[in-house]
Amino acid sequence: MDQSSSPSQPESQAQPNLCIPCSLGTCLIHFHEFSSSSFMDPVSLFCSSPYPNLPPHSRSSSLESKKPSVASQDVKSDGTLPIGTNNNPLIPSHSQESSHWTIRHESMPSALAGSSAQSMQQFPSITQNEENFRFKKSFTQPQPIVKETTFPKSEPGQEHAKLSDLSYEEFLKKYSSTKVERVSEAAPPPSSLNSSTVLDENDSLISQGSSVDDQTDFLGFDDSLSYAYILNPTSDSDVDLIRQYFIPKEGTYTFSNMHIRYVSANPKTPVMYMVDPAYEPHKQIARYEKLQQIFQVVEATVSPEVGERLIGLYFRYIHRVYPVIHGERFLLAFKKAKHKLSPILLTAMYASSIIYWDADKELRNYPRLDAKKLWDLTEDFLDLSFSLSRLSTLQAAIIFLTGRPWINVAGNWSILTRAIALAQILGFHLDCSEWQIPKEEKILRNRVWWALFVNEKWLSMYIGINASIRQDDYLVPPLTDNQLLAGEQRIADSFNVFVKMAELSILLQNVLQHLFNARAVMTMSKNRRTVAQKISKYLISLEEFSCSCNLRENQPGSLSLFLQIDALELLLRKTALKLKLTDAVYQQEMLNVVQRCVSHFLAINESHFTDFFWPYSQFYFCILSSAIIKMYLDFEFNENFNATTFGLLSSFTKHCVWLKFRNFDLVFMAYKRLNALLIELSSGRPLIGKLLQETFEHRKRNLDETLT
């Protein structure tokens, strides 16, 4: 580990104990070891004496790794777990009998709650026996699940290529192009599924001699049932009292099974985290059992070979523009210790990659997985996981929100609001630049927050719900294009798209907050001059932002970014036209904007199908289709504009149908809505009727059939 990035040791620390919060992903005593060596879940908040009721001499000196399963009936009637027994997931057993200390289902992800050897070297008072202790979870054997799909196997004498062909840098270089290959006719199943998606064992990006335990976090069904959260000035725990009388600067304090860690470098604005024990552990145990069952379904659905290809697609098309995980750490774990990855995160990555299935020549010959089923499983995972503080839960939620296709808008909003609440509980809305945590963790925390911010603003705009993040609710500094992690130099251009999307979302926040909050909408017609001034100011800012986007035409994610710029300008122009602000000027400007938007829409072709698109584009296409139809109806009897507006409508409709029949999912909603509206407008309008006949393959007015 890079010692230069490691924070200093706390001056005072509790008696050395094995670290349950490390398993939780909320360790702040070992945060220098935990966060810099594991970025699957670097919440890195807290760790102190996890066994306050256990004498130091009674800790086992010979147990080496495995822990018995815990059943719900082991919980006492008062909701606590027995201390000093092998059934308490928070207390290590003292028994030397190890006959029942076995992992009953080796394929299930397990979690280690002990610290790595590297961290123990930094705490010399901990004995070597304690250093060797590993605290693993065991689950009862689940019922076997029959796989729903059968995948081709390798021929005898041939082996699957493992995920060790390329380094992270080489992988990004190899897949720097996003050019799509057209789907060919069905070919016979391949004899082997070649893969080149993860790090080489001698990758220079990984510190020499590092083990998997040094480089990965132990996620998933970990043993800790504690809750981590940040203390605020209005919290029931008095921050000033704790800081002044119970805990030194950058120190720790433990009382009544609760652990506090002080991380603020500025005593005037203290920042502390607390970890409370679970008050209803029997419910958490039941939750873990349900999570286990869900992941068994995932493993039965996604074979290891197909899973490798899907992860390759994720890093090839999504991670480049949307880097919300630590790619290097994840790929290393995927290669060496896949069972230690977060099941919820892995499932979300699988589901989000299916949209690019046809871009992989090998996957074309395999039965296509049901994306909806994997998204449903991800949603089930999230529903069960939001009650525990995990960064992997946040990352999975963020990936879920950008997944395609969207099916349940209300469900997505529910996931989004819970993810925002969890991020605020864990302090992701605060400026961590002065915190005593590694630089890489600071970068990742900022990325996660801005990814949530982007999703919240655009979803709020498109579905018309008031934003839940206000301008005064966060202190996170803006993203910059130089905030790259190890091995990400080759995706710097694509990362700039993410930076620009966050910047555009800040502008959108101002528009929504000042023009479209509930009170402003109700009084808009009474304050037309003020509204006109605000719209003019925002249009100037949007033009300046657009000019600052020095992006290549074929840069991954750039087309989707420009579509969102068009969407925001269209919103502002529509609002001005609705208020009849100098009609002639705004009508002409509105027509110019629609022409430019249609021009960008017509530029979408098959080479863009594997580009990264924000899923909100589907709402924008619907808004654009409605704007074109309204403009045509407004100018239906205007000789100067009638031909122009009908030409726009005809071009948009034909291209929308063309994209739909090539399975470009982002136009499905616009296709259905456009078809329904044109059917309703075709009566008495020969031009519309002819357009409908030429572009759509049916002429029935039965709306139910047109929407199938």
From Swiss-Prot:
Signal peptide: none annotated. Keywords: DNA-binding, Metal-binding, Nucleus, Transcription, Transcription regulation, Vacuole, Zinc. It is found in: Vacuole; Nucleus. Residues 58-72 have a biased composition (Low complexity). GO terms for molecular function: DNA-binding transcription factor activity; RNA polymerase II cis-regulatory region sequence-specific DNA binding; zinc ion binding. Residues 56-101, 180-200 are annotated as: Disordered. InterPro entries: Carb_Metab_Trans_Reg, Transcription_factor_dom_fun. This is Uncharacterized transcriptional regulatory protein C105.03c. It comes from Schizosaccharomyces pombe (strain 972 / ATCC 24843). The lineage of its organism: Eukaryota, Fungi, Dikarya, Ascomycota, Taphrinomycotina.
